[in-house]
Amino acid sequence: MEWHQDWAFYPYTNDDVLAVGVMLDDFTLDNGPLLLVPGSHKGPVLDHHSDGRFSGGIDPRSLHVDVSTAVPVLAPAGSISVHHARTIHGSDLNRSGQPRGLLLYEICAADAWPLAGGYGPFSDLEEFNARMICGEPTIEPRLERVPVRMPQPRPLDPTSIYNAQKGLERRFFAVLDKP
């Protein structure tokens, strides 16, 4: 999983947006755990395009942060991780032969409305409001001056981040070629 910011996939009207990961398996150094770059959420939103299309990853030449400071998330199955949607993160190859499942949830403030991506389609406000876990529903989004880059044009295969990142010309992490 190349270095990326979740915010690049789903920008909102304000950046009160978090990613919550539930570890379905143990996360160890051998199985390529999630790596988080501390403080990177306070920096710019980096370009996630390659060859004119959104690719879901940052070109290594554009990484203007010291990724050697990245902190591995090491924890047993059942643990959670929480990071800001603008945090630069990624993970190296899983070399352990053991699974490394992570179930990700995106949560945001009630007044953070998606500009692109995010939430998925909803047919009406009732369905939209049913997704609230706390707070009061609102149809008045809070607009803040936050850096936004739109994830357009879409990747050739937008079905997953892994497929989107296949379009990257340059990579930081090694990849396995599977038949």
Label for each model-derived stretch:
Residues 27-92:
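Double-stranded beta-helix
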Residues 1-12, 48, 134:
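Non-heme Fe(II)-dependent double-stranded beta-helix
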Residues 4, 11-29, 74-77, 82, ...:
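Short, conserved beta-strand element in jelly-roll/cupin
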